[in-house]
């Protein structure tokens, strides 16, 4: 199977998304949205600098294939990147498994929409596999991480692994450009606190108080992922 030919309403939706991304890149999300949608932009999602919009698609209208086409579109028009990081969120584990299989299957229409843009160097993985992608591959190949929304809900104590300090990310963070981690300050659970160190039976965190965690969430945040 190759890339599906998009229906007219699907292409229209992507064209609108591309127009917004291009305008947001030069004018900012709020002004771009106001000009294109004719109503005020809602800043509640990610603030004034990071664009957040919804596409209205009918039930059964091919939202997944649109998402696959939206990744290279937004990477090009908003980020100007040919090796983006995208976090693909779904509402349940069953849908996560289904989506992951499709995006990893050669020839599947969803994967084809991505490989048409990025070739077979495309990396599609789960949260558990992020640390296995070699540090030099970030920024050189497109990376799509498929996860459930619940994995990032910080109030869910059972789902906080993405924010936990993990030594498996040591080579990633130690190789990060100097000063690049300043952007992590102020993000939820991004920095090791004195309380964290006191609760750490291993003693590892004592030397990291006030510094960004070596965590999955922080590593993704460093790469300004499409969401």
Predicted regions span which residues?
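RecA-like P-loop NTPase motor core of helicase/translocase proteins
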Residues: 1-227
């Amino acid at each position: 199977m190759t890339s599906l030919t998009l229906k007219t309403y699907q292409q229209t939706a992507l064209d609108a998304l591309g127009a917004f991304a291009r305008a947001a890149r030069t004018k900012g999300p709020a002004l771009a949205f106001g000009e294109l949608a004719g109503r005020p932009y809602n800043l509640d999602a990610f603030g004034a600098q990071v664009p957040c919009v919804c596409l209205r698609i009918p039930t059964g209208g091919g939202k997944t294939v649109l998402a696959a086409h939206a990744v290279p579109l937004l990477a090009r028009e908003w980020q100007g990147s040919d090796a983006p990081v995208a976090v693909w969120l779904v509402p349940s584990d069953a849908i996560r498994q289904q989506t992951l299989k499709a995006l990893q299957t050669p020839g599947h229409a969803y994967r084809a929409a991505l490989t048409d843009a990025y070739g077979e160097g495309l990396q599609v993985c789960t949260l558990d596999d992020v640390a296995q992608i070699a540090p030099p591959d970030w920024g050189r190949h497109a990376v799509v991480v498929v996860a459930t929304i619940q994995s990032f809900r910080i109030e869910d104590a059972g789902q906080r692994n993405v924010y936990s300090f993990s030594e498996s990310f040591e080579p990633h963070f130690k190789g990060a450009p100097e000063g690049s981690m300043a952007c992590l300050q102020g993000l939820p659970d991004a920095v090791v606190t004195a309380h964290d160190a006191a609760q750490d039976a291993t003693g590892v965190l004592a030397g990291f108080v006030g510094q960004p965690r070596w965590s999955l969430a922080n590593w993704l945040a460093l790469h300004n992922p499409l969401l």
